[in-house]
Amino acid sequence: MGSERIMTTQQQFLDLLSDIEPSTTTVNDCSSAHNTLRDALKVHNEFSKVHVHTFLSGSYKRNTAVRPTTIGGITQRPDVDIIALTNHTINDDPQIVLDAVHTALKDIGYTDLTVNRRSVNVKLKKVDMDVVPIISDGYGGYLIPDIHLEEWLVTNPPAHTEWTVEVNKNANGRFKPLVKLFKWWRRENLSDLKRPKGFILECLVAKHMNYYESNYEKLFVYLLETIRDSYGIYASLGIIPHLEDPGVAGNNVFSAVTADEFKTFFEKVEEQAAIARNALNETDDDKALALWRQVLGNRFPRSASHKSANSADMASSLIRSALGAGLTFPSTPVYPNKPGGFA
């Protein structure tokens, strides 16, 4: 019974992972949007003078994004990060560089624009894009403008992408799926919390996941419990832990997280770790399903045994209806195309 439930639950997690992947439509929308913008920047009559090249960053590039959520019947837009390497120098004022990006985008025809601290946000009907200008530091690294601090800061977007690939390889391909589960968990449980999110969650998973476990149920429980056991003292004292930025030595990925945000995040992890542990120990499929849905939401699927029973009933009903209507069936099975992930 125990081994059967482990296999069943592993399939439930794999089914959930398939379900929370960005759809082919979403991927195509993102691809079309970022390519159009990047091509336009490259040939813009003014920006082309400072343009060196552009590349993608963020969860879209790292293949750690989950499907856009729907709030109040409205599907939220996916985020795409576009890095624009320019030939500006450290002597150029950060505001001037961001203004140059903003002016070019406005001139190209984008209307819903917001100049943020380190980027220009572009809102389209189906996609949000952040255009982030960076410059070379002259030594193989990069600098990013910060208009609040009015200075250039060390950054390294390509290193984050390379790091993600390496960590996923070390985890036998299970790092990125676990990140997606953790991001989905956060959305289900802490959707109103501003931070931690995104890349911070990826760093937490990399630091605290079990690299030798292959079962996703156990991986997820272990992740929550290890985060709970590692950061209780920080939450109780109201201080922010240091989690090293894998791209920039000495940087703390938690630096923008407030003490209150971290405490809220920690308390939810603590609460949910207990529920997840109970779900792992539960031998009754229905009770385990109810517990996992408390943790990962109502999209968490039923076990294969439940689905196969329901499918058999449905298939029988459909066949009876089809025969009654005089329909014919194809001689070979037709398989649906599974949605691909972000690339």
UniProtKB/Swiss-Prot annotation:
InterPro entries: NT_2-5OAS_ClassI-CCAase (IPR006116), NT_sf (IPR043519)
Induction, per UniProt: Part of the CBASS operon consisting of cdnD-cap2-cap3-cap4.
Textual note on the cofactor: Binds 1 Mg(2+) ion per subunit.
EC primary class: transferase
Reaction catalysed by this enzyme: 3 ATP = 2',3',3'-c-tri-AMP + 3 diphosphate
GO molecular function terms noted in the UniProt entry: ATP binding; metal ion binding; nucleotidyltransferase activity
Record-level GO BP terms: defense response to virus; nucleotide metabolic process
Cofactor (UniProt): Mg(2+)
Alphabetically ordered keywords of this record: Antiviral defense, ATP-binding, Magnesium, Metal-binding, Nucleotide metabolism, Nucleotide-binding, Nucleotidyltransferase, Transferase
EC annotation from Swiss-Prot or TrEMBL: 2.7.7.-
Family of this protein: Belongs to the CD-NTase family. D01 subfamily.
Name of the protein this chain belongs to: Cyclic AMP-AMP-AMP synthase
